[in-house]
Regions:
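Peripheral, non-AAA+ core regions of ATP-driven protein-machinery
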Residues: 1-111
Length: 111
């Protein structure tokens, strides 16, 4: 199931729209694509650990996370919350009907 979440990349005081797309399908592994820097790539481990500590399960399937547009560099930890919500919604663990109505950014702790 494909989930789209709106967030933003901050450039100075300007917010440039970014879309986090999360898809869960047959296969294995977690893949992050879309010109993410090291901090964004590290967010996967932080996000997975935070979800597990809150009692959510990580599907034993292939999870693809795309940060669009693909031609724009993304940096920072503000993508943690959109990625986490995308995994929760795409795996069917919660119904999040208002997800598409808000721009979401935020960092997660491990707990």
């Amino acid at each position: 199931m494909l989930i789209n979440i709106s967030c933003a990349k901050c450039i100075g005081i300007k917010a440039v729209p970014v879309r986090v797309e999360v898809d869960i399908a047959t296969g294995i592994g977690i893949h992050l694509v879309g010109l993410a820097d090291a901090a964004v790539k590290e967010s996967l481990l932080r996000t997975i650990t935070a979800l597990q500590s809150m009692g959510f399960r990580i599907p034993g399937k292939k999870i693809v996370i795309n940060l669009a547009p693909a031609d724009m560099h993304k940096k920072g930890s503000g993508y943690d919350v959109p990625i986490a919500l995308g995994i929760i919604a795409a795996s069917g663990q919660r119904d999040l009907p208002l997800l598409g109505k808000y721009m979401i950014m935020g960092e997660l702790g491990l707990d």
